[in-house]
Structures are given as C-alpha cells and as structure tokens.
Amino acid sequence: MSNPNPATPPAPSWFAGFAAVALLGYAAFLGLNFSPFAGGSDSSGYLNAAKLLARGQLTAPPRDFAGLTVSSPTQLQPLGFIAEPARGRLVPTYPLGLPAHLALAGLLFGWTAGPLVVGVGATLAAIFLLYAIAREFRFVWPLAALGSVLFGAFPVTIFVAVQPLSDVLATTWVLAAFYAALRARASLDWAVAAGIALAVAVFVRPTNVLVLPALVVLLGAHWRSLAAFLIGGLPGALLLLAANAHLFGSPWRMGYVPVFEAFRLVYAAPTLLHFAKWLGAFAPGLVIVLAVAGFRPRSLSIRERLALALWFFVPFSVYACYEFSHEVWWGLRFILPAVPALILVALAALDHWLHSRPRLLAPAIALLLLWAVGGAVFWTRHFHTLLTKTYERAYADVGVWARTHLPADTVVTAHAESGALYYYTPFPILRWDQMSPAEFSAHAAHLARAGRPLHLVVHESEESSALNERAPARWEKVAALSQRTIWRYVGPAP
C-alpha cells in the first residue's frame, strides 16, 4: 500500500533546532514544577501501585493490626486500595498502565526522578505526536506547530502534566495509535503498531477504548489492515482481562465504582454546560469556532472527518454522563485524550480558510499563539496550578516525619493522608472516617490491650470531625506540620 496523502513542503532547516529549544524550555518549566510526591488519592494510588509492580507484586499483603477485626473492610484500606481481609490482600484500585510506566522509570531513575521522566516525557511525546499527525493530515508545518502549542498551553494539560496522573499519558498513547493508523495506509506494520498503542492506551485508562470506532474508520475497510490492527491489540486486551479477573474477580470489573453507578444520563445537562464553559474559557475562542466549521473543509476526506468526529464526540458524550466530570474545572482532564481531535479539526478549518489567503497565515498563527500562551499564563496563575508541588509535598513531609518519629510498632489512623502514609511509612493504616465512635473506641481498646501505640494524622480543617465526632478519646498532640496535626492516643474519652 502507498500513502495517498500528497506531500506538503518540509519545514525549513532552522525549525528543528528552534522546536528542540522550545521543547527543552517547556520540559524545564514542567520539570521545575513537577510534583513527584505521593499525595492525595490519585498520586498516592498510582505510586503505591507502581511500588508494588516494581517488587513484582499486583497486590499488597496486609500490615500487622495485632489481630484487629473490623465491621467493614473500608476501615483497613488506605486511599487508592480495596481491602480484602478474607483474602489477606490490598488491591490497587487504579488501572495498571501508569503504575507500570512509573515502576519501570522508578527502577531506572529512582522514585524522585522516575515520575518526572514519565510525566514530562509523556507530555513532550504528546506534543510531538500531535505535530506529526497534523502533518499526516497534510497541514503545513506552521499550522502543525500551532496545534502542538495549543495542546501544550491548554491549562488542563499543564495542570495534569506536573503531577503523577494518567491523563497526559493516556492522551499520548491515543495519539500514538492515531498516528500509526494514519501511517498504516503505507504499511501493515503500522496497523499492528496502532493496535499495540491502543492496547497500552486502554491499560492506562480503560475508557480509551472509546476511540476504537474512530481508529477503525481511519484504518478503512481493508481487511488486512483491520486484521493487523487486531493482531497488535489482542495480546494487550487479553492481558488486561486476565489482570482484571485476578484483581477484581471478573475480566469485566475494574477498581472504579460500577459503571452504572458512575455514568448516568442525569449528569449530562450540568456536565455539558460545564464542558462548554471551560472549553470556551481555556481554548482560544477562535479555535472553538474553527472546530465547528472544520468538519466542512475539503482538505479532509469524508473518512478523516468522520474519524475526527468520532474521536472527539464519543468520549465527550460518555464523560458528559460521568458523575465527577462537572464538579471542578479540571474535570476536563477526563476528555483530554479527545482534545487533540478538536484542535485538528480547528486546524483543518484554518487551513481551508488560509489556502486562498496565504498572506494571512503568519498573522493568524501569531494571534492564536499569543492568545493560547497568554491564556495559559493567566489561568495557571488564577488557579495556582504551580503551587501543586507545594500542596503535594505536604503529604510527603507528614509521611517522612511519621516514619522517622513515631514508634516502629504504631498503628496510624488517617483519612486524606492515608494513601501517602501507606507509601512513606511501614505502618498499618486505619481509616477514622470509616468508623463510628463506638467502633473506634473498640479498636483503640483492642490495640491498647495488644500494647500497640495508636496515632492519628489529620488536616487542621478536619480536626473537629476526627477528634470529637469520629474518634472521641483523650488525645495528646505530638506534632504540627504542613497544616496537619499528629496526635497520640492516651485513653478512652472521659
């Protein structure tokens, strides 16, 4: 097979050097602000799972609670885990794709540099792949470069790129699958690569399977291409199903909440308004207008337009019904793997409009570049995105302090800090937010009889709830740091 795409003029020789310098500068910006810490539920969940994989384990054995029995397994599970006391294990709730990347990078570069390599590397790869895809769609190099900048400057991209989260990595592997599918017109090897890339993308985020219809359309009706694509993706699909069966008891179950609970039509209306509001705010307004018009230009074939439409609208529509999509501005991260399709369609419209107006190419691109970069600066400051490292470091500081100052045989009870404490310490973790006062009193008495110290870690904002409502007792404050307080159990409440 030969690639039917007519060649576009190559970029000038100076562009490669300029792009390399720009990417290095962007990488330095992300690297300086990257948070490699196990903090809240997401970052600690991924890093805890990565540590297990690095040790050759899928699940963690229980830590020693001195024979404590509980009424609910949730009392024994740090954030990011499902506790199964009957089977003697903790099961990570997050998909294994990102933890596998983190585990490999952690073994090669250490657990501080490793997450940074994955996070920054995935972002740079996504930017490069988007440029390459735009060139495959026959856009001139300045437009392709504009598309990459639009993605890199997207405020949600920056927000997730400075944390050990799966969103950018999920997007990178989706982009790799689409690039390979476009190249598959020239070689069946690329169709196999597209299947492999999609399998990895689904390992990173299972809902990436939603881009499958778009890839099938892009590959076309050639049965050889589709068969090669299937050959590439099938081993990964079988491995994912086997992992699900081992971890969650069924090939079709995952660690997330059940699909029919998390995805409901009742969420669609508020989420669509939420998505429209923040896409309009974050993307240059002209990009949205161009994207709407971009399905008409003849610069794209009908098959290409259909593939781009499916790439964007299928994930967009499904996540519009997701319980958590409309809660915060960064809920847009759920549809980040679909955002490149929106950018590509906008580029198609711009390419069509500028075809007969070549003198306007440079001013139009300059305007959109300034708009995108200016918006990135404004929103990054507005949402204090670059303070993420400071916020997440607080969890690590508390974990390191606990490991170095608390007795080796202590049991720690915590809520928001539970995943981080599991990562940074060897202590058994109890969840005070999952207990009634009576249950806490019984657990504390059991641990006291066993001669085990008990400490409570809590954010200052939750002190009243923890100390007075959930875990009433006589407590002695032993430390205060990073807006958290650490308390030692002295005895039952008077």
Report the location of each language-model feature.
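Signature aromatic-anchored transmembrane alpha helix within multi-pass, membrane-resident enzymes
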Residues: 14-23, 196, 230-238, 301-305, ...
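Hydrophobic, aromatic-rich transmembrane alpha-helices
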Residues: 127, 217-220, 280-309, 313-316, ...
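Membrane-embedded, lumen/periplasm-facing catalytic core of multi-pass transferases
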Residues: 364-417, 448
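Transmembrane-helix motifs of polytopic, lipid-linked glycan transferases
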Residues: 104, 114-138, 176
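Membrane-lumen/periplasm interface segments of multi-pass, membrane-embedded glycan/lipid transferases
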Residues: 84, 241, 245-300, 320-321, ...
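Perimembrane helix-loop-helix junctions
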Residues: 180-187, 192, 210-237, 262-263, ...
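Interfacial juxtamembrane loops and adjacent helix segments
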Residues: 51, 55-98, 102-108, 260-266
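Multi-pass, polyprenyl lipid-linked donor-dependent membrane glycosyltransferases
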Residues: 41, 115-122, 141, 146-176, ...
